[in-house]
Amino acid sequence: MSFESFLLFIMVFLLVVLVIFSVFNAIFFRKNKNKYDALLAEYCQQGLDLDLITKVAFHFGHLVDYQKILWFVLLYKGVKIKYTKERYVQPEAYQFVQSLPDEKIDWILKLHRLYLIHFAIMTLWFLDLFVLFVFYK
């Protein structure tokens, strides 16, 4: 097997893995959608800051599931987020998410880790594509 054939095989293999990961992540989010909706409703009832992307993400289906959970992941990890040019997200928003019981936040953190693995595999796929393009024009 030549190096070019090996790279093509890896490219196809990674593409199949990416499709499987995408389907699995979409199913995993859909399975927990009621938990997400309840968490979002509870969060909004508190009058806490919510970014525009999270507000409109439900219109785009599973294509933006990562964006739906990212807001809560960043708050859970305590990342300083600018809400407007003048101010950061309220400290109460961080406290709310960080004080959630494990059963409400663990699935979001797990899905976030799965998306990070997904993005790492996608990076490998693009790297493989780049090598094929550069060396085998």
Predicted segments with their positions:
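Juxtamembrane boundary at the C-terminal end of a transmembrane helix
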Residues: 126-137
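Loop-to-transmembrane boundary segments
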Residues: 60-68, 99-123
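Membrane-proximal soluble regions of multi-pass membrane proteins
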Residues: 38-100
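Feature marks short, highly hydrophobic, charge-poor N-terminal signal-anchor/signal peptide-like helices
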Residues: 1-13
